[in-house]
Swiss-Prot record:
GO terms for molecular function: DNA binding; zinc ion binding. Residues 80-175 form the Toprim domain. One of its GO terms (biological process) is DNA repair. CDD domains: TOPRIM_recR. Belongs to the RecR family. HAMAP family: RecR. May play a role in DNA repair. It seems to be involved in an RecBC-independent recombinational process of DNA repair. It may act with RecF and RecO. A zinc finger (C4-type) spans 57-72. This is Recombination protein RecR. SMART domains: TOPRIM. Keywords: DNA damage, DNA recombination, DNA repair, Metal-binding, Zinc, Zinc-finger. It comes from Protochlamydia amoebophila (strain UWE25).
């Protein structure tokens, strides 16, 4: 089947979204073609403004449109505990559980030799400084239950072992190979409540 060039380009771009295959991209493209022009302009401007305005928090690495994010307000959070995640989206997944009230630290990924991502590519030194400066008592490691997530968790445990802090990890009720982004709130809430020493 031969689509017009501009439609083909739109389908190709939509396929870049995670979990969107060719058929879904086709459906989205045809749906967008039926949108009124003002909705398309609004979508385009919203995407551009979001990309322009949203940045990483200077403290924790989460997403914000201010210098420091909501999650770093020590007057609103338990400042003795810090939850370490790989990506900002993980912070929002955990927040949806309403089970955690501490601070966060986003590493910016996990260790991955296949992608040439070593410890120097992650925000580990910043984490260590924050633990000292804030006199953190507990670090909760909330990384995906994958080989890379497990390797990163073990690395963090070794790096932080000298500090006099409790290190815990989300309970292993999470399915192996799962991504926090796809775990339902109930499962994530139980995993947070049942976290264990690590």
């Amino acid at each position: 089947m031969r689509y017009p060039e501009h439609l083909l380009k739109l389908i190709h771009i939509l396929k870049k979204f995670p979990g969107v295959g060719h058929k879904s991209a086709e459906r989205f493209a045809f749906h967008l073609l039926n949108w009124p022009m003002e909705h398309l302009i609004e979508l385009s401007e919203t995407v551009k403004n979001t990309k322009d305005k949203i940045k990483q928090c200077l403290n924790c690495g989460c997403l914000t449109d201010e210098a420091a994010c909501y999650f770093c307000d020590i007057n609103q959070r338990d400042s003795q505990i810090i939850c370490v995640t790989a990506f900002p989206r993980d912070v929002f997944s955990i927040e949806e559980t309403h089970e955690y009230r501490g601070l966060y630290h986003v590493l910016g990924g996990v260790l991955s030799p296949l992608e040439n991502r070593g410890p120097e590519h992650l925000s580990i030194s910043r984490l260590k400084h924050r633990i000292q400066d804030l006199q953190i008592k507990e670090v909760v490691i909330a990384l995906d239950s994958t080989l890379e997530g497990d390797a990163t968790a073990l690395f963090l445990k070794q790096e932080l072992a000298a500090d006099d802090i409790q290190i815990s990890r989300l309970a292993f009720g999470l399915p192996m190979g799962s991504s926090l982004d796809y775990v339902d709130g109930g499962t994530l809430a139980r995993a947070l409540a049942g976290r264990s020493r690590f």
